[in-house]
Amino acid sequence: MAVLWLLWPCRVGLGWGHEGHAVVGLIAERYMTAEALTRASDLLDGSTIDSVASWADDYRRDHRETGPWHYIDVPLADSELDMARECPNNECVIAKTEQFLAVLKDPKADRATKAETLKFVIHFVGDMHQPLHDEDDGDKGGNARPVTFEGHPDNLHWVWDTGLLEHINRNQQDLAAELARHITDEDRATWTQGSIEDWVMEGHRLAQAVAYGDLGSQNPAVISPDYEKQAAPVIETQLEKAGVRLAYLLNTALK
C-alpha cells in the first residue's frame, strides 16, 4: 500500500513532529476501548490523545536529561538488540516506555504521576516507529548524515522526521482517517503480537533496508523521487502500526 506519495506535490508542513504524532494519536483513539478512553481523558483533564502527543518533545526542551528516552542507538549493522549496551541505565525509548506503562498499571501511583507518564507513553510509541529512532550508524541516528532534499542541504533524520511528510496534502484528521481505512482486523491482530523490543527491531530493519539501504553512495546523498516512493509506504505503515499498538498498550494499561 502506498496511498500517500501520490499526494506529495504540495508542501503543507505536516511532520512526524507535532502533526505526525497527532496522527498516531488519532488512529489510536479509533481502537481504544471506551474504558481506556474515559480513563485517559480523566488523567489528561479532558484533553484528547492526539492533542498531547507532542508534549514530551516540548518537555524535553527544558529537561534535556529526557532526550535519550526518545530513541535507542542500535548499531545499523547489527541484527540483534543488546539492551545492556544500547540502553545503559535504562535510558532509552524501550525501557522508559515499559517503565511508564508499569506506572499506569500501578494502583498506588498518584494521579499526577500517571498523567505525566501517559503523555510520555503516547509520544514514545510514536517515536519508536520512526526507523531512525531505532538505529545509529555513527551519525547520531542520521542527524549527522548530510543529504540534499529538494535542492537544499538537510540531514537524513530530519528528512524522515519531517521532510518527507511535509509533502502530504492532508490535514491530520483526514490523514488519520485515510490511513485507518486501510487497517484490517488481521492487521491489528498481527501488529499487536510481539514485544516493544520486537517493534523497535522491526523499525531497525526498515532503517537498514530503506532509510539507508536506498540512500546510495553519494555524499551528501540526494533524496530522489524514487527514494521518496520507496519511503512512502514505510512511513504510512509505521504511522498505522504506531496507532494500533498505542491503542493496544493503553487498553491494557488503563483497565
List where the protein language model places each region:
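Sec-dependent N-terminal signal peptides
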Residues: 1-2
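Hydrophobic core
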Residues: 5-6
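N-terminal signal peptide c-region/cleavage motif recognized by signal peptidases
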Residues: 9-12
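N-terminal, motif-rich segments that launch catalysis or mediate targeting to/interaction with membranes
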Residues: 14-124, 131-255
